[in-house]
Amino acid sequence: MKFAKVLIIPALPLILCCSALAGESVKPETLPEGQHMYVIERVIPGAGKLTSAELKGIAQTSCGVLKEMGPKIQWLQSYVTGDKIFCVYLAPNEEMIREHAKKGGFPANAVSEVSTIISPKTAE
């Protein structure tokens, strides 16, 4: 499995900040012109059982690819579930998202553009 190779390669130097916006609340309608928000569904059997060290290695690989690709693509955060990882990225287009996945050896089973975000505050 190609993805397994990512877990056993030597770790890249830790990049402390993959995205200038990481940890901040970002809404698609407030993005600069030409930037779009995407949710990437990555089917990874056993994802929820990955160790902290394995997740760190995956994050380091992703950040290394992002650094190589430049500031037009940014990783905001990811959600790890039983057999999937859902990642939120900013990029000018879906092709750049898929290029990142290919370069990092990550699956990108579905890439969906986010049109808006709702939360409990939406009900107020």
Feature locations, PLM:
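Positively charged n-region of N-terminal signal peptides that target proteins for export
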Residues: 1-5
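Bacterial N-terminal signal peptides
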Residues: 8-19
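Short, structurally constrained coil/turn elements
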Residues: 16, 69, 105-107
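Short S/T/G/P-rich N-terminal loop/turn motif that feeds into the first structured element of a domain
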Residues: 18-68, 74, 119-124
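Short, well-ordered beta-strand segments in beta-rich or mixed alpha/beta enzyme
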Residues: 38-43, 75-101
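Residues that form or immediately flank small-molecule/cofactor binding pockets and catalytic motifs
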Residues: 45, 80, 113-116
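A short linear hydrophobic-aromatic micro-motif
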Residues: 71-77, 110
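An amphipathic, aromatic/His-enriched active-site/gating alpha helix that lines ligand/cofactor pockets
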Residues: 90-119
